[in-house]
Amino acid sequence: MRALVLGAETPAGRALAAALAAASARIALVAAGADTATAFEVQRLSRRLGTLSQAIDATNEMAVRVMTRQVAKALGGLDALFFCADLGAATAEAFALACRFTAREMAPGRGRGGAIVAALPAGAAADVGALAAEHAPKGVLLLAVDAPPHPDDAWARDVLARLAPP
């Protein structure tokens, strides 16, 4: 699997990154905020797991577009996006941007579909239903999972298991 974890600085992002690395996935970890402390935190995690890393403003359309293209190119395509960024009122906008640009990289015209997982705390605003309907014809599955305050390895493995083919 070639996966992008956007919001890798969150507890859910860290747990999913570790589970993906343990499953030998090729992954890119992206901090959803461009502040220095967050960027360094994700960079340290990336070094430990042996992955790519970036830090962007996840609400900036151009930043998200460029990042998804760079990640897809570096990984040889994208199979999954794990969106874990909790940006408060800006979460829904950032999620929609991430869906739009990663779905393009997963499009069936590129020979594949893909999956987008919104792993957000309960109550975080993200209109998964509308986005799922928009991207389903492109072969992209959207899945929403509640991210607990302190996700563990079992939670992360369960999320990954939901993406496994039947």
Residue positions per predicted region:
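Short, aromatic/basic amphipathic alpha-helical patches
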Residues: 38-46, 124-133
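Short, well-ordered alpha-helices that flank and scaffold nucleotide-derived cofactor binding pockets
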Residues: 18, 22, 69, 100, ...
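Hydrophobic/aromatic beta-strand patches that form the interior of the parallel beta-sheet core
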Residues: 28, 54, 82, 115-119, ...
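Active-site loop of short-chain dehydrogenase/reductase
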Residues: 76-80, 92-123, 136-141
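Active-site beta-alpha turn of Rossmann-fold NAD(P)-dependent dehydrogenases/reductases
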Residues: 7, 85, 110-121, 128-132, ...
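C-terminal helical subdomain
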Residues: 97, 130-166
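Short-chain dehydrogenase/reductase
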Residues: 1-76, 80, 84-90, 151-166
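Short, ordered loop/turn segments at secondary-structure junctions
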Residues: 32-34, 121-122, 147-148
